Amino acid sequence: MTRLISSLAVALSAVAVTHAAYPTAPKSTNYVIVGGGPAGLVLAEQLSRSGKNQVTLLEAGPDTINTQLLQTPYTYPIGAVGNVWNYTAQPDPNLGGNAPNMFQGWGLGGGTAINGMAYCRGAASVFDDWAAASGNQGLAWKSLFQDFLEVSHYAETFDAQYGQYVNKSAYGNGLLEVSRTSGLTGFEAPFQQAVEAELGLHEVDMNDGDGIGLDRGISSIFAQNRTRSYSRNTFGILAMARSNVKVITNAWVTKINFNGKTATGVNYQLNGKSVTLAADKVIVSGGAINTPKLLLLSGVGPKAQLSKLGIPVVQDTPQVGLNLRDHPFAVVQLEVTPDIITLWQLTSNTTEAAIAQQQYAKNRSGPLGWNNGFVYATFRVPDSVFDGINGTHYTSMPADRPHVLIEFSGVPFISGGNFSAISTWASLIQPEFTGRVELKSNNYLDNPVINTNYYGTAADKAAIIYGYKKLRQVLAHDTVKVKTVDEFYPGVALNSDDAVWQAIQGQTFSFGHPVGTVAQGKVLNSDWTIKGLKNIRVVDSSTFPFPSSCHPQAVVYALANRAAKDILRDDK
């Protein structure tokens, strides 16, 4: 793998965007990969490595590698705006009719090009349960841990002036570089001290299998030049430097073609024209929203839904689009003292913005190389909270499995306040509820219909109320109070669980972590193929049987690495 990293360095110097789009699209290929996110780009790099396979990757969005706002960590919320599938779910009755936005990455890099760069694997037992659900023992923690080592490496930040627990044995020598932040916003220590005092948690590294505790955060940021480390400028650059790889951007796949039950290729739109690509094998890596959408448009899904829309049924697979889970989070937003560095300061204060720009331009120092503050904690909800309701989903989980994550960021999630804001939130990270993704019509241009069903069971509701109350308990601790000017939201005394619930309903967001809509064990066989079909596989977050207990980008890289091994073994 050290050799691969050296190859990446050579590719970085030799390749800009010359391989980003091909004026003459190929007519056939060994593997077509639909989607240029982390799964698709890892697969492209792995499947092309021997030089024997012709690999074509089709990405609906643009290249992202020269988009400065995405490459600069602190400005990711701004840069992401133009590089997303701007999906909005249906009004959710559990949220009083509010309709969550569910942005997905659009462009090479997918979600890794627009996310907050959190690199976290979470509880080991999640993956052992995935192995049981899927029948693929390669997904068990002991096996998948090797894939985590193979896809990432840790680099020490040269100017970090603070202590942080990092278990360096949990990192390998793969292409993706991860690091800790090079500076602090001023809110990290108060928040950490409050969490330790109020919740009794201690610091861990959630990349070594620990699921519960406090983590000061590892991020997918290059340690030295403080730019985003993501699938496009790691796996993508290496793959795209090879003559047997074709990556075509702005290529929107509209349909998978079949001969009977055998996938034979895809149709896609490029420059206003429909193009047909024949392929020996089709791999769909569009993510948990776009993958089920494409399968449904191609005739793979519930027969009743497809027939209603006039789509010929290739395979009646009722579970396609079902089992949608996410990490919904409910916000408490604070106005903080001027010494805390926030996104508002750097976008509203021209003096602070100029200083930050000068620091970053000079030697990559200063807040522009950070990702807006980054400390989070995870914990379980006591069994007693579920007294009188069916809480088996939560109470039966392995002891290392957390139910709730709390976190903060210097990004104001709630608009309307002209002040320096810190957003804090409580998130259900092992929810019971499931939603679904369906088609609006048989037109590929129409957005899918997304029903989130957040907090959809009595146990979910009890768990998020408990988590939200614990978050506010942390924020009431003296170390945080001295940094707080006012509580912007909810901003009132919440004297009952009903009042807490109303506050949660009023400001719940999607974490952008949808999973499960083409799940292993339900839609897929253990070898990533779709049950009942041939020559088609799915590899992305849609295949998760249920969510990981932390931010999922780290898991997608490892999962794709494991899938590539399985594919190369099976296709010999």
Swiss-Prot record:
Instruction: Give the Enzyme Commission number.
Output: 1.1.-.-
Q: Which SUPFAM superfamilies match?
A: FAD-linked reductases, C-terminal domain, FAD/NAD(P)-binding domain
One Pfam family name from the record? Answer: GMC_oxred_C
Q: After gene disruption, what is the outcome?
A: Significantly decreases the production of dibenzodioxocinones by approximately 67% and significantly decreases the growth rate.
According to the record, the signal peptide region is 1-20
Its annotated pathway?
Secondary metabolite biosynthesis
Induced by what? The expression of the dibenzodioxocinones biosynthesis cluster is positively regulated by the transcription factor dibT.
The catalytic site is made up of: 513, 551
Question: Keywords assigned by UniProt?
Answer: FAD, Flavoprotein, Oxidoreductase, Signal
Q: What class of enzyme is it?
A: oxidoreductase
Please give the Gene Ontology molecular function terms for this protein.
flavin adenine dinucleotide binding; oxidoreductase activity, acting on CH-OH group of donors
Give the protein's biological function. Dehydrogenase; part of the gene cluster that mediates the biosynthesis of dibenzodioxocinones such as pestalotiollide B, a novel class of inhibitors against cholesterol ester transfer protein (CEPT). The biosynthesis initiates from condensation of acetate and malonate units catalyzed by the non-reducing PKS pks8/GME11356. Pks8/GME11356 lacks a thioesterase (TE) domain, which is important to the cyclizing of the third ring of atrochrysone carboxylic acid, and the esterase GME11355 might play the role of TE and catalyzes the cyclization reaction of the C ring.
Q: Tell me its family.
A: Belongs to the GMC oxidoreductase family.
Record protein name field = Dehydrogenase GME11362
Which species is listed as the source? Answer: Pestalotiopsis microspora
What phylogenetic lineage does the species belong to? Eukaryota, Fungi, Dikarya, Ascomycota, Pezizomycotina
